[in-house]
UniProtKB/Swiss-Prot annotation:
Gene that specifies this protein: POG1
Annotated organism of origin: Vanderwaltozyma polyspora (strain ATCC 22028 / DSM 70294 / BCRC 21397 / CBS 2163 / NBRC 10782 / NRRL Y-8283 / UCD 57-17) (Kluyveromyces polysporus)
Top-level taxonomic group: Eukaryota
GO terms under biological process: cell division
GO cellular component, one term: nucleus
Function: Transcriptional activator which promotes cell cycle recovery, after pheromone induced G1 arrest. May also be involved in stress-resistance.
Bias type Low complexity, positions: 139-150
Assigned keywords, A-Z: Activator, Cell cycle, Cell division, Mitosis, Nucleus, Stress response, Transcription, Transcription regulation
Protein's UniProt name: Transcriptional activator POG1
UniProt keyword annotation of Cell division present: yes
Bilayer-spanning residue ranges: none
Length: 426
């Protein structure tokens, strides 16, 4: 008995292999199609994602008719929203135009400017906020600090060498000194104590010279009619020396030539410039700040030695400009004058001051001073400002004692300390 073995059929095996290969190919194709579908989504998927539905899982179950109807409804709703927005904008625009028409300040130029702003393309990127907010502007420049950034004003200063600045300063100081010295020389009056000492003369010659001075001043200050018309004055003229007669004749001729000056101007010395006074009077005369006349007299015509004196009227009007012993000497000379001449001089001064309503300076009871000077003296003569022996200088502008002009020979000094109990004069 032998065993029987079944051998597989060659045809059947080949068929099985072909079927398996075909199945594998189909599976691969299906997978590739799925991948292609996933990589290339359909238009439906794209629209649904754009609307905001997200990734739809049941897209295959949605039919095309339903999808198309949904899209139509969505588009219609958006169109209505746009129409409503247009209508509201038109209403607002009509209200704005109406207000602009009613407003007088709104002109065509402003309308054109608004249209230009709307038409410009570069303004489309600008978005205005609905509510105005206060924002801090950022500065483009770096922060200014004293350590890092220098000061602009210090950079604008012109730089120069030190020696140039010193030279310019010295020149300015010299110019100022020259100007002040020139002004002081013009304003300062001559000092009666700056001349060399006078040679001593006999008492009789001094009395004669003083009488000549008094008569000469009386002829210059009294009216022309009373001076040159009376016989007494003519008799007095014959008693003077020859030099005084010639001087008086020259003065009389110049006064007659310059007849425009009034009688009061001749007496008071007002409205008289330096040029005019030098033409009318001889070179010995000059005008004081009080309006009176002073004379510089030479004792002899041959030897002109400087002997500066003043009239009795000017002496009594300005008692503070002379030392005490000077008044005593002049009072002694007045007492020793001829009684007839002294009486005639006193009558002339009384009549002259009665004519102009002034006090008689010849009287020993009163000393005539201007109003402003008397007030100043009243303020200065305070019991704690000056002692009884001092002679204050009226209207002394310089506070330094070195710069003040020495008007008196003896200058007393008082050292006063003002306290709350004794305050300074006001």
């Amino acid at each position: 008995m032998g065993s029987s073995t079944t051998e597989p059929d060659v045809g059947t095996t080949s068929n099985i292999e072909t079927t398996t290969t075909l199945q594998n190919k189909n599976v691969n194709e299906v997978d590739q199609n799925k991948k292609s579908e996933q990589s290339n989504p359909s238009f439906k998927e794209v629209v649904l994602k754009d609307i905001g539905l997200g990734e739809a899982t049941d897209l295959e179950n949605v039919s095309d008719d339903v999808f198309n109807n949904y899209l139509a409804i969505r588009l219609e709703r958006e169109r209505k929203e746009i129409e409503l927005l247009k209508e509201s904008n038109l209403e607002k625009l009509s209200v704005i135009i109406k207000n602009c028409i009613e407003c007088n300040s709104f002109t065509d130029e402003t309308m054109k400017r608004l249209i230009n702003l709307v038409d410009n393309n570069y303004n489309n990127s600008v978005h205005f906020s609905p509510k105005s907010k206060r924002r801090k502007l950022e500065s483009t420049s770096p922060p200014m600090s004293s350590s890092s950034v220098p000061n602009k004003e210090t950079n604008n200063i012109q730089q120069s060498n030190s020696y140039q600045l010193r030279n310019n300063y010295d020149e300015e100081q010299e110019n100022q000194k020259s100007q002040t010295q020139g002004s002081k020389s013009l304003l300062s009056r001559p000092n009666i104590y700056s001349f060399p000492p006078k040679q001593t003369q006999p008492a009789s010659q001094q009395h004669v010279q003083l009488a000549a001075i008094v008569q000469r001043q009386s002829t210059l200050t009294t009216p022309l009619s009373s001076t040159y018309g009376s016989n007494s004055n003519n008799s007095m003229n014959t008693q003077l020396p020859l030099s005084d007669k010639s001087l008086r004749s020259n003065v009389q001729e110049k006064i007659v030539q310059q007849g425009s000056m009034s009688q009061r101007d001749i007496i008071n010395g007002s409205n008289m410039s330096s040029q005019y006074s030098s033409q009318v009077y001889p070179p010995g005369y000059y005008q004081t700040r009080y309006g009176q006349q002073m004379v510089v007299v030479y004792p002899d015509s041959d030897s002109p030695q400087i002997n500066q004196t003043s009239t009795i009227q000017h002496q009594q009007q300005l008692p503070h400009t002379y030392p005490p012993h000077y008044h005593q000497q002049q009072q002694l000379h007045q007492n020793q004058l001829v009684p007839q001449q002294h009486q005639q001089l006193q009558q002339q001064s009384i009549s002259k001051h009665q004519l102009f309503g002034q006090k008689n300076p010849m009287s020993p009871q009163s000393h005539y001073l201007p109003n402003n000077e008397s007030q100043n003296l009243g303020v200065i003569n305070h019991r704690r400002s000056f002692s009884s022996g001092t002679y204050p200088v009226v209207n002394s502008r310089s506070k330094s004692p070195d710069r003040s002009m020495p008007l008196t020979v003896q200058k007393q000094m008082n050292f006063l300390i003002h306290t709350p109990k004794h305050p300074p004069p006001t």
